[in-house]
Amino acid sequence: MNWSELYWQRITPLHLLLWPVSLLFVLFQSIRRHLYRRAILTSVHLPVPVIVVDSITATSPVKTPLIIQIVNMLRASGLRPGIIGHGYTDNYHSPMSVTIDSPLQLAGKKSLLLAYYLRETCPVWIGHDRIEVAKALLETHKECNVLICNDGLQDLRLQRDFEVVIVDTSVINSGNGLIMPAGPLRDSFARLKHSNVVVQAGHHRQIPDIGEEIRTFYITPLKEHFFNLSRPELTASAAELANKRIHAVTCDPDIQNFLDNLKFLRLTVTPYIFSEDHHFVAEDFPFDEAEIILIPEEDAVKCFNLHDERIWVLQQEYRVDLGLRTIILKKLREKFMDPKLLDILACPLCKGPLIYKKDRLELICKADRLAYPIRDGIPVMLEDEARRLPDEEEIK
Protein backbone atom coordinates (compact mmCIF):
# COMPACT_ATOMS: atom_id res chain seq x y z
CA MET A 1 0.00 0.00 0.00
CA ASN A 2 1.45 3.39 -0.97
CA TRP A 3 1.46 6.50 1.19
CA SER A 4 -1.50 8.20 -0.48
CA GLU A 5 -3.74 5.15 -0.04
CA LEU A 6 -2.77 4.94 3.62
CA TYR A 7 -3.51 8.66 4.01
CA TRP A 8 -6.94 8.31 2.37
CA GLN A 9 -7.96 5.41 4.59
CA ARG A 10 -7.68 7.32 7.83
CA ILE A 11 -9.25 10.27 9.57
CA THR A 12 -6.63 12.07 11.62
CA PRO A 13 -6.36 15.59 13.08
CA LEU A 14 -4.81 16.61 9.76
CA HIS A 15 -7.90 15.36 7.89
CA LEU A 16 -10.15 17.31 10.24
CA LEU A 17 -8.13 20.45 9.55
CA LEU A 18 -8.43 19.88 5.80
CA TRP A 19 -12.13 19.01 5.86
CA PRO A 20 -13.27 22.69 5.71
CA VAL A 21 -10.98 23.12 2.69
CA SER A 22 -12.77 20.20 1.03
CA LEU A 23 -16.15 21.84 1.67
CA LEU A 24 -14.89 25.12 0.20
CA PHE A 25 -13.62 23.23 -2.84
CA VAL A 26 -17.05 21.63 -3.43
CA LEU A 27 -18.75 25.00 -2.98
CA PHE A 28 -16.35 26.60 -5.44
CA GLN A 29 -17.03 23.88 -8.02
CA SER A 30 -20.80 24.26 -7.57
CA ILE A 31 -20.60 28.02 -8.09
CA ARG A 32 -18.47 27.54 -11.21
CA ARG A 33 -20.97 25.05 -12.67
CA HIS A 34 -23.79 27.51 -12.00
CA LEU A 35 -21.88 30.35 -13.67
CA TYR A 36 -21.13 28.26 -16.75
CA ARG A 37 -24.73 27.05 -16.91
CA ARG A 38 -25.94 30.66 -16.82
CA ALA A 39 -23.33 31.61 -19.47
CA ILE A 40 -21.78 34.13 -17.08
CA LEU A 41 -18.52 32.25 -17.63
CA THR A 42 -17.88 31.33 -21.25
CA SER A 43 -17.12 27.77 -22.30
CA VAL A 44 -15.50 26.81 -25.60
CA HIS A 45 -17.22 24.70 -28.24
CA LEU A 46 -14.88 22.64 -30.42
CA PRO A 47 -15.78 21.79 -34.04
CA VAL A 48 -15.91 18.02 -33.39
CA PRO A 49 -17.68 16.02 -30.65
CA VAL A 50 -15.87 15.78 -27.31
CA ILE A 51 -16.11 12.81 -24.93
CA VAL A 52 -14.73 13.38 -21.43
CA VAL A 53 -13.60 10.25 -19.58
CA ASP A 54 -12.53 10.84 -15.99
CA SER A 55 -12.73 9.40 -12.50
CA ILE A 56 -14.54 10.75 -9.44
CA THR A 57 -11.58 9.49 -7.38
CA ALA A 58 -8.03 10.79 -7.53
CA THR A 59 -6.76 7.53 -9.02
CA SER A 60 -8.38 4.70 -10.93
CA PRO A 61 -6.50 1.81 -12.56
CA VAL A 62 -9.35 1.24 -15.02
CA LYS A 63 -9.33 4.67 -16.70
CA THR A 64 -6.56 3.91 -19.21
CA PRO A 65 -8.01 0.53 -20.31
CA LEU A 66 -11.49 2.09 -20.54
CA ILE A 67 -10.20 4.86 -22.81
CA ILE A 68 -8.43 2.29 -24.99
CA GLN A 69 -11.65 0.29 -25.32
CA ILE A 70 -13.63 3.41 -26.24
CA VAL A 71 -11.01 4.36 -28.86
CA ASN A 72 -11.10 0.87 -30.37
CA MET A 73 -14.91 0.93 -30.37
CA LEU A 74 -14.98 4.27 -32.18
CA ARG A 75 -12.42 3.14 -34.75
CA ALA A 76 -14.32 -0.09 -35.37
CA SER A 77 -17.37 2.07 -36.12
CA GLY A 78 -15.39 4.03 -38.70
CA LEU A 79 -14.58 7.12 -36.65
CA ARG A 80 -11.16 8.73 -36.20
CA PRO A 81 -10.65 9.64 -32.54
CA GLY A 82 -7.88 11.68 -30.96
CA ILE A 83 -6.97 11.95 -27.27
CA ILE A 84 -6.27 15.16 -25.38
CA GLY A 85 -5.11 15.54 -21.79
CA HIS A 86 -3.61 17.88 -19.26
CA GLY A 87 0.14 18.33 -19.35
CA TYR A 88 2.77 18.32 -16.67
CA THR A 89 4.46 21.43 -15.29
CA ASP A 90 7.46 21.03 -17.60
CA ASN A 91 5.28 21.47 -20.71
CA TYR A 92 3.12 24.13 -19.11
CA HIS A 93 2.82 26.38 -22.16
CA SER A 94 2.91 24.39 -25.39
CA PRO A 95 0.67 21.58 -26.64
CA MET A 96 2.75 18.54 -27.53
CA SER A 97 2.22 15.26 -29.30
CA VAL A 98 3.00 12.23 -27.16
CA THR A 99 4.88 9.28 -28.66
CA ILE A 100 6.73 6.41 -27.03
CA ASP A 101 9.90 8.51 -27.44
CA SER A 102 8.50 11.44 -25.44
CA PRO A 103 10.32 12.20 -22.16
CA LEU A 104 8.54 10.75 -19.15
CA GLN A 105 8.89 13.98 -17.16
CA LEU A 106 7.01 15.86 -19.90
CA ALA A 107 4.36 13.36 -20.91
CA GLY A 108 3.62 11.41 -17.74
CA LYS A 109 2.96 7.69 -17.36
CA LYS A 110 -0.70 7.61 -18.41
CA SER A 111 -0.20 9.53 -21.66
CA LEU A 112 2.84 7.43 -22.56
CA LEU A 113 0.89 4.23 -21.96
CA LEU A 114 -1.92 5.47 -24.21
CA ALA A 115 0.60 6.42 -26.90
CA TYR A 116 2.21 2.97 -26.62
CA TYR A 117 -1.02 0.97 -26.85
CA LEU A 118 -2.60 3.19 -29.53
CA ARG A 119 0.47 4.01 -31.61
CA GLU A 120 -0.29 4.68 -35.29
CA THR A 121 -4.04 4.41 -34.61
CA CYS A 122 -4.91 7.39 -32.39
CA PRO A 123 -2.91 10.59 -31.73
CA VAL A 124 -2.33 11.60 -28.10
CA TRP A 125 -1.70 15.27 -27.27
CA ILE A 126 -1.23 17.01 -23.93
CA GLY A 127 -0.71 20.52 -22.60
CA HIS A 128 -1.74 22.88 -19.84
CA ASP A 129 -4.68 24.40 -21.78
CA ARG A 130 -6.93 21.61 -23.05
CA ILE A 131 -8.63 23.95 -25.53
CA GLU A 132 -5.32 24.84 -27.17
CA VAL A 133 -4.28 21.18 -27.09
CA ALA A 134 -7.47 20.20 -28.91
CA LYS A 135 -6.99 22.91 -31.54
CA ALA A 136 -3.37 21.86 -32.11
CA LEU A 137 -4.35 18.21 -32.48
CA LEU A 138 -7.15 18.98 -34.93
CA GLU A 139 -4.87 21.26 -36.95
CA THR A 140 -2.22 18.54 -37.21
CA HIS A 141 -4.59 15.58 -37.60
CA LYS A 142 -7.35 16.92 -39.80
CA GLU A 143 -8.80 13.43 -40.14
CA CYS A 144 -9.80 13.30 -36.45
CA ASN A 145 -13.56 13.68 -36.07
CA VAL A 146 -14.07 12.99 -32.36
CA LEU A 147 -11.96 13.88 -29.32
CA ILE A 148 -11.57 11.98 -26.06
CA CYS A 149 -10.40 14.02 -23.08
CA ASN A 150 -8.72 11.65 -20.64
CA ASP A 151 -9.27 14.01 -17.73
CA GLY A 152 -11.08 17.34 -17.55
CA LEU A 153 -13.99 16.36 -15.32
CA GLN A 154 -13.69 19.73 -13.59
CA ASP A 155 -12.53 21.76 -16.59
CA LEU A 156 -15.94 23.27 -17.33
CA ARG A 157 -14.43 25.68 -19.85
CA LEU A 158 -14.26 22.71 -22.23
CA GLN A 159 -17.71 21.97 -23.63
CA ARG A 160 -18.36 18.27 -23.78
CA ASP A 161 -20.95 16.33 -25.76
CA PHE A 162 -20.70 13.22 -23.63
CA GLU A 163 -19.27 12.61 -20.18
CA VAL A 164 -18.22 9.25 -18.76
CA VAL A 165 -17.43 9.28 -15.03
CA ILE A 166 -15.64 6.32 -13.47
CA VAL A 167 -16.59 5.32 -9.94
CA ASP A 168 -14.03 2.88 -8.55
CA THR A 169 -15.70 1.38 -5.50
CA SER A 170 -12.48 -0.43 -4.55
CA VAL A 171 -10.96 3.00 -3.90
CA ILE A 172 -14.09 4.40 -2.25
CA ASN A 173 -14.61 1.36 -0.01
CA SER A 174 -11.06 1.62 1.32
CA GLY A 175 -11.15 5.41 1.60
CA ASN A 176 -12.34 7.76 4.30
CA GLY A 177 -15.22 9.12 2.19
CA LEU A 178 -13.86 12.67 2.17
CA ILE A 179 -13.19 15.00 -0.73
CA MET A 180 -9.70 16.16 -1.65
CA PRO A 181 -7.48 17.29 -0.06
CA ALA A 182 -8.86 15.37 2.92
CA GLY A 183 -9.79 12.21 1.00
CA PRO A 184 -9.69 10.39 -2.36
CA LEU A 185 -12.84 11.93 -3.89
CA ARG A 186 -12.35 14.71 -6.44
CA ASP A 187 -15.95 15.88 -6.08
CA SER A 188 -19.13 14.94 -4.27
CA PHE A 189 -21.28 12.09 -5.57
CA ALA A 190 -23.90 14.69 -6.46
CA ARG A 191 -21.57 15.63 -9.35
CA LEU A 192 -22.51 12.32 -11.02
CA LYS A 193 -26.00 13.69 -11.75
CA HIS A 194 -24.44 16.05 -14.29
CA SER A 195 -22.73 13.24 -16.24
CA ASN A 196 -24.17 11.16 -19.09
CA VAL A 197 -23.14 7.75 -17.80
CA VAL A 198 -21.29 6.23 -14.88
CA VAL A 199 -18.87 3.35 -15.33
CA GLN A 200 -18.49 1.43 -12.09
CA ALA A 201 -15.38 -0.57 -11.26
CA GLY A 202 -14.75 -2.73 -8.23
CA HIS A 203 -17.55 -4.18 -6.14
CA HIS A 204 -21.10 -3.83 -7.44
CA ARG A 205 -22.79 -1.58 -4.92
CA GLN A 206 -25.31 1.22 -4.88
CA ILE A 207 -23.69 4.57 -5.54
CA PRO A 208 -25.20 7.32 -3.36
CA ASP A 209 -26.80 10.44 -4.84
CA ILE A 210 -26.66 9.20 -8.42
CA GLY A 211 -30.37 9.20 -9.18
CA GLU A 212 -32.26 6.85 -11.49
CA GLU A 213 -31.84 8.86 -14.69
CA ILE A 214 -28.07 8.28 -15.00
CA ARG A 215 -27.17 5.01 -16.72
CA THR A 216 -24.59 2.85 -14.94
CA PHE A 217 -22.35 0.36 -16.73
CA TYR A 218 -19.73 -1.96 -15.31
CA ILE A 219 -16.11 -2.58 -16.21
CA THR A 220 -15.03 -6.03 -15.05
CA PRO A 221 -11.51 -7.47 -14.75
CA LEU A 222 -10.82 -10.55 -16.82
CA LYS A 223 -7.67 -12.63 -16.93
CA GLU A 224 -4.18 -11.23 -16.49
CA HIS A 225 -1.55 -11.96 -19.10
CA PHE A 226 1.95 -10.88 -20.09
CA PHE A 227 3.23 -9.25 -23.27
CA ASN A 228 6.78 -8.72 -24.47
CA LEU A 229 7.77 -5.06 -24.25
CA SER A 230 10.03 -5.15 -27.33
CA ARG A 231 7.60 -7.28 -29.36
CA PRO A 232 4.11 -6.59 -27.98
CA GLU A 233 2.53 -9.03 -30.41
CA LEU A 234 4.10 -11.80 -28.29
CA THR A 235 1.90 -12.72 -25.34
CA ALA A 236 2.12 -15.40 -22.68
CA SER A 237 0.04 -16.75 -19.84
CA ALA A 238 1.37 -17.32 -16.35
CA ALA A 239 1.41 -21.06 -17.00
CA GLU A 240 3.73 -20.56 -19.98
CA LEU A 241 6.22 -18.67 -17.82
CA ALA A 242 5.97 -20.88 -14.75
CA ASN A 243 9.12 -22.94 -15.36
CA LYS A 244 11.34 -19.99 -16.29
CA ARG A 245 13.93 -18.25 -14.15
CA ILE A 246 12.07 -15.03 -13.39
CA HIS A 247 13.16 -11.74 -11.88
CA ALA A 248 10.50 -9.18 -10.96
CA VAL A 249 11.61 -5.55 -11.18
CA THR A 250 9.55 -2.55 -10.11
CA CYS A 251 9.65 0.98 -8.81
CA ASP A 252 5.87 1.19 -8.62
CA PRO A 253 4.72 2.63 -5.26
CA ASP A 254 2.22 -0.22 -4.95
CA ILE A 255 5.00 -2.81 -4.88
CA GLN A 256 3.29 -5.35 -2.67
CA ASN A 257 0.22 -5.52 -4.91
CA PHE A 258 2.46 -6.38 -7.89
CA LEU A 259 4.28 -9.12 -6.00
CA ASP A 260 1.00 -10.46 -4.60
CA ASN A 261 -0.40 -10.69 -8.14
CA LEU A 262 2.60 -12.72 -9.27
CA LYS A 263 2.24 -14.99 -6.24
CA PHE A 264 -1.47 -15.44 -7.01
CA LEU A 265 -0.47 -16.47 -10.54
CA ARG A 266 1.81 -19.10 -8.96
CA LEU A 267 4.99 -17.57 -10.28
CA THR A 268 8.19 -17.86 -8.26
CA VAL A 269 10.22 -14.70 -8.72
CA THR A 270 13.29 -12.95 -7.41
CA PRO A 271 12.20 -9.36 -6.62
CA TYR A 272 14.27 -6.23 -7.27
CA ILE A 273 12.80 -3.00 -5.94
CA PHE A 274 13.86 0.52 -6.93
CA SER A 275 12.76 3.91 -5.63
CA GLU A 276 9.59 5.40 -7.12
CA ASP A 277 11.42 8.17 -9.01
CA HIS A 278 14.01 5.80 -10.50
CA HIS A 279 14.58 5.87 -14.27
CA PHE A 280 15.64 2.49 -15.61
CA VAL A 281 18.84 2.00 -17.60
CA ALA A 282 20.28 -1.18 -19.10
CA GLU A 283 22.68 -1.52 -16.17
CA ASP A 284 19.70 -2.09 -13.87
CA PHE A 285 19.21 -5.53 -15.46
CA PRO A 286 22.62 -7.23 -15.06
CA PHE A 287 21.20 -10.62 -14.07
CA ASP A 288 22.38 -12.95 -16.82
CA GLU A 289 20.70 -15.92 -15.19
CA ALA A 290 17.21 -14.43 -15.66
CA GLU A 291 15.24 -15.82 -18.57
CA ILE A 292 12.29 -13.51 -17.91
CA ILE A 293 12.14 -10.03 -16.35
CA LEU A 294 8.64 -9.06 -15.24
CA ILE A 295 7.56 -5.45 -14.69
CA PRO A 296 4.17 -3.87 -13.89
CA GLU A 297 2.38 -1.88 -16.56
CA GLU A 298 3.13 1.45 -14.87
CA ASP A 299 6.88 0.79 -15.15
CA ALA A 300 6.76 -0.16 -18.82
CA VAL A 301 6.97 3.50 -19.85
CA LYS A 302 10.39 3.70 -18.17
CA CYS A 303 11.77 0.81 -20.22
CA PHE A 304 10.78 1.70 -23.79
CA ASN A 305 14.39 2.51 -24.76
CA LEU A 306 16.03 -0.59 -23.23
CA HIS A 307 15.27 -3.07 -26.05
CA ASP A 308 15.71 -6.09 -23.78
CA GLU A 309 13.59 -8.94 -25.11
CA ARG A 310 13.56 -10.58 -21.67
CA ILE A 311 11.27 -7.83 -20.35
CA TRP A 312 7.61 -8.83 -20.10
CA VAL A 313 4.77 -6.66 -18.82
CA LEU A 314 1.92 -7.79 -16.57
CA GLN A 315 -1.35 -6.52 -18.04
CA GLN A 316 -4.89 -6.77 -16.68
CA GLU A 317 -7.66 -7.22 -19.24
CA TYR A 318 -11.12 -5.71 -18.74
CA ARG A 319 -14.58 -6.11 -20.22
CA VAL A 320 -17.00 -3.18 -20.47
CA ASP A 321 -20.77 -3.57 -20.76
CA LEU A 322 -21.81 -3.42 -24.42
CA GLY A 323 -24.50 -0.90 -23.58
CA LEU A 324 -21.82 1.78 -23.22
CA ARG A 325 -20.97 1.47 -26.91
CA THR A 326 -24.63 1.79 -27.87
CA ILE A 327 -25.26 4.93 -25.84
CA ILE A 328 -22.05 6.67 -27.01
CA LEU A 329 -22.78 5.97 -30.68
CA LYS A 330 -26.37 7.15 -30.23
CA LYS A 331 -25.10 10.50 -28.97
CA LEU A 332 -22.57 10.77 -31.79
CA ARG A 333 -25.28 10.06 -34.37
CA GLU A 334 -27.15 13.08 -33.05
CA LYS A 335 -24.04 15.21 -33.49
CA PHE A 336 -23.26 13.97 -37.00
CA MET A 337 -26.78 14.83 -38.15
CA ASP A 338 -25.49 18.41 -38.35
CA PRO A 339 -24.33 19.03 -41.96
CA LYS A 340 -21.92 21.69 -40.69
CA LEU A 341 -19.99 19.00 -38.85
CA LEU A 342 -19.91 16.71 -41.87
CA ASP A 343 -18.65 19.58 -44.02
CA ILE A 344 -15.49 20.02 -41.93
CA LEU A 345 -14.43 16.36 -41.93
CA ALA A 346 -11.19 15.45 -43.71
CA CYS A 347 -10.05 12.39 -45.64
CA PRO A 348 -8.00 10.05 -43.41
CA LEU A 349 -5.61 9.33 -46.30
CA CYS A 350 -4.80 12.67 -47.93
CA LYS A 351 -6.07 14.87 -45.06
CA GLY A 352 -7.91 16.92 -47.67
CA PRO A 353 -11.51 18.18 -47.47
CA LEU A 354 -14.52 15.97 -48.12
CA ILE A 355 -17.68 16.78 -50.04
CA TYR A 356 -20.88 15.81 -48.26
CA LYS A 357 -23.45 14.22 -50.59
CA LYS A 358 -26.69 14.14 -48.65
CA ASP A 359 -28.65 12.26 -51.31
CA ARG A 360 -26.11 9.40 -51.36
CA LEU A 361 -25.13 9.55 -47.68
CA GLU A 362 -21.49 9.70 -48.71
CA LEU A 363 -18.44 11.84 -48.07
CA ILE A 364 -16.42 12.27 -51.26
CA CYS A 365 -12.65 12.72 -51.39
CA LYS A 366 -11.97 14.36 -54.73
CA ALA A 367 -8.20 13.87 -54.58
CA ASP A 368 -8.29 10.10 -53.92
CA ARG A 369 -11.64 9.54 -55.69
CA LEU A 370 -13.09 7.71 -52.71
CA ALA A 371 -16.61 7.82 -51.29
CA TYR A 372 -16.85 7.13 -47.56
CA PRO A 373 -20.30 5.86 -46.51
CA ILE A 374 -22.45 7.31 -43.73
CA ARG A 375 -24.08 4.32 -42.07
CA ASP A 376 -26.70 4.62 -39.38
CA GLY A 377 -25.69 8.24 -38.93
CA ILE A 378 -21.96 7.53 -38.44
CA PRO A 379 -19.35 8.51 -41.08
CA VAL A 380 -17.33 5.35 -41.75
CA MET A 381 -13.83 6.70 -42.44
CA LEU A 382 -12.25 3.36 -43.34
CA GLU A 383 -10.47 2.87 -46.66
CA ASP A 384 -11.68 -0.73 -46.90
CA GLU A 385 -15.28 0.47 -46.60
CA ALA A 386 -14.93 3.33 -49.09
CA ARG A 387 -16.31 3.12 -52.61
CA ARG A 388 -13.75 3.70 -55.35
CA LEU A 389 -15.21 6.22 -57.81
CA PRO A 390 -14.96 5.15 -61.46
CA ASP A 391 -13.14 7.51 -63.80
CA GLU A 392 -16.33 8.38 -65.66
CA GLU A 393 -18.14 9.49 -62.49
CA GLU A 394 -18.05 13.25 -62.24
CA ILE A 395 -17.48 14.86 -58.85
CA LYS A 396 -19.33 18.10 -58.27
Swiss-Prot record:
Organism domain of life: Bacteria
Report the enzyme's class at the first EC level.
Answer: transferase
Q: Where is this region: Tetraacyldisaccharide 4'-kinase?
A: 1-336
Q: Which Gene3D superfamilies match?
A: 2.20.25.10
Pathway the protein acts in: Glycolipid biosynthesis; lipid IV(A) biosynthesis; lipid IV(A) from (3R)-3-hydroxytetradecanoyl-[acyl-carrier-protein] and UDP-N-acetyl-alpha-D-glucosamine: step 6/6
The record's section on InterPro entries has: LpxK (IPR003758), Trm112-like (IPR005651)
Question: Which UniProt keywords are present, listed alphabetically?
Answer: ATP-binding, Kinase, Lipid A biosynthesis, Lipid biosynthesis, Lipid metabolism, Nucleotide-binding, Transferase
The reply on keyword Lipid metabolism is yes
| One GO MF term attached to the UniProt entry | tetraacyldisaccharide 4'-kinase activity
The task this protein performs is described as:
Transfers the gamma-phosphate of ATP to the 4'-position of a tetraacyldisaccharide 1-phosphate intermediate (termed DS-1-P) to form tetraacyldisaccharide 1,4'-bis-phosphate (lipid IVA).
| UniProt record similarity statement | In the N-terminal section; belongs to the LpxK family.
Q: Which PANTHER family match?
A: TETRAACYLDISACCHARIDE 4'-KINASE (PTHR42724), TETRAACYLDISACCHARIDE 4'-KINASE, MITOCHONDRIAL-RELATED (PTHR42724:SF1)
Protein name, per record: Tetraacyldisaccharide 4'-kinase
Gene name for this UniProt entry: lpxK
